């Protein structure tokens, strides 16, 4: 079956892509404005390059058509902290996807503990295994639509000591949660690559 995306509705496009581009890592993004901490998850999230270290997140709009707080805060303050989600944080991450009023904080609403590691960046979520401290690189204009891709420079990376199994080789292990359609999944069995012929 062929789906013509020029004819399909926006909801159809999302359903098709969200269920076939899988699994998708989740960026649990922390931003801050005038003392209010905003936390929201985004699964349109990829690493663009390790040199220069850059990632991309795509941020939509609120139900009333205005910019989500994450987008507004990054546009204004040029900073964010991206936390990687593991199974232990699944519930609170999911709850933080609910739309709140602009001056409300998911941190207080859902009892999400944060800790400030660097003064120049928003705090990270205390319980996560890994966090990226980022600043704004550029916004990509897709020529309309409801989603705004943001390219972010990764300036510092935090990894919990207990998740670094080999410090010399920088070998890191944790149990990430991925997005598949409207559901979540863990990675499960690790597959070993076959030897090249």
Feature names for model-found ranges:
Residues 1-197:
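Basic, polyanion-binding surface patches
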């Amino acid at each position: 079956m062929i789906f013509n995306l020029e004819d399909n509705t926006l909801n159809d496009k999302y359903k098709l892509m969200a269920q076939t581009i899988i699994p998708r890592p989740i960026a649990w993004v922390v931003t801050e404005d005038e003392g209010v901490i905003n936390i929201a998850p985004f699964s349109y999230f990829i690493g663009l390059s390790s040199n220069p270290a850059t990632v991309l997140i795509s941020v939509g709009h609120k139900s009333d058509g205005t910019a989500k707080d994450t987008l507004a805060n990054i546009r204004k303050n040029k900073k964010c902290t991206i936390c990687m989600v593991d199974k232990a944080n699944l519930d609170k991450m999911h709850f933080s996807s609910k739309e709140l009023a602009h001056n409300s904080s998911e941190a207080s609403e859902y009892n999400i503990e944060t800790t400030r590691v660097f003064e120049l960046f928003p705090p990270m979520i205390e319980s996560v295994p890994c966090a990226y401290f980022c600043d704004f690189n550029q916004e990509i204009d897709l020529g309309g639509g409801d989603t705004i891709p943001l390219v972010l420079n990764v300036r510092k990376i935090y990894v919990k000591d207990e998740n670094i199994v080999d410090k010399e080789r920088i070998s890191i292990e944790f149990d990430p949660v991925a997005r598949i359609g409207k559901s979540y999944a863990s990675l499960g069995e690790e597959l070993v690559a076959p030897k090249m012929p």
